[in-house]
Amino acid sequence: MKYAFDPDWTAKSHEIAKTLGYKWVMPDRLTVVRSWGSKTRRTIARIHCIGKVMMLGMGHKKSFYVIELITEKFDRQPQKEQLETIIHELMHIPRTFGGGFRHHDHVCSQNVKAELERYANMQVLVK
């Protein structure tokens, strides 16, 4: 597998989080990377965080999240679905921003689609 930092989607994810009012998402501790060569069949993107033990071992006190976009899958999505994917991954970040994840009982299709619609409506209001 190969990985590369994606500045465009990093900036877009920060903008989405800000627009949706996700004040707990700290832009300086969230990045987006692309990966190539994944063998996964269904995964389009995933979110990672350095575990507390690793953070402590590395001398870091603050959590850091990375959204990984599986390039072969993500790039085939229409723009609306790409936004939905990013929102889905952002919704996994808990309000504590402490290194954990919110589970799929919260990050379900219905909630993600509601957030996507809310984001789209906010974009219309801005224009």
Regions found by a protein language model. Name each.
Residues 1-80, 96-127:
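Metalloprotease/metallohydrolase-associated module, dominated by Zn2+-dependent proteases
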Residues 84-96:
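Active-site recognition of the HExxH zinc-binding catalytic motif
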